[in-house]
Amino acid sequence: MRDKLNLLIFFIAALLIALGLRFTPTISFAGLILLLAVVPALMLRFRDFFSREAVIAGIFVLGLALNALIGVALAYTKSMEFGMSLLSLLPLTLVLTANVFATSLVIRIDASGKEVFAFYFWFLISVGLAFLFLLPTGGSAEISPRGAGWFRFVEFPILYSELALIPSAFCLVFQRVRTFLFFSPFPLFLDMSWSSL
C-alpha cells in the first residue's frame, strides 16, 4: 500500500510540474516539493534497479544532456515566458538528477535506508544553502545573459558534473556515507567565479 501511495504521489507531482510549466511556476514548485519527498522512498523500493551500473551511468548521461540543452536554449531564447519555463526546470535537471545519481551510488555500496535518506536530504539542503550564496543581488538578471553559446552549452553540464561526482567520489573512495556529508556544498563554492562571468 505504501509503495502504491508513493507512486501516486510521484505521478501527481510530475503532473503538477507539467502544469506549472504551462500556467504558473507556483504549481510547479508544489509539484517539486512532492517529488523531492517521495524520490528516496521509491529508490529504496527499487533498490536493485538503481544499484545497477548501467542505470547509474544512464542517469548521469541524461543529466548532462538535459542541462546542455537547457543552457543553449537559455542562451538563444528571446521569449521571457519560455526562458522562465526553462529556468523552472533547473532544480530538476541540475540538482535532483545529480542527487539521484549520487544517491544511487550510496545505494550501491549497501548503505542502510536511514543513511540513504540522510544523504539524499542533506544533499538537497546543502546545495540549496550553497546556491543562496550564488544568487545575483543586483535584481537585473537576464534570461539570456551575454556570452557565447558554446559557454552556455558547457556551463550547466560542468556544474551538474561537479554536483554529481564530487560527493560521489568520496562515497566510493571511503565507502562511508558520513565521510562526504561535509563536502556536498563544496562544488557550488567552486563555481562562485562562474557567477561573475
Curated annotation (Swiss-Prot):
UniProt KW keywords: Cell membrane, Membrane, Transmembrane, Transmembrane helix
Cellular component, GO annotation: plasma membrane
Major localisation: membrane
UniProt key word Cell wall biogenesis/degradation: no
Membrane-protein topology: Multi-pass membrane protein
Transmembrane parts of this sequence: 5-23, 27-46, 55-77, 87-109, 116-138, 153-174
This protein's record includes keyword Cell membrane: yes
Compartment(s): Cell membrane
Domain of life: Archaea
Name the record gives this protein: Uncharacterized protein AF_1579
Source organism: Archaeoglobus fulgidus (strain ATCC 49558 / DSM 4304 / JCM 9628 / NBRC 100126 / VC-16)
Native organism taxonomy: Archaea, Methanobacteriati, Methanobacteriota, Archaeoglobi, Archaeoglobales
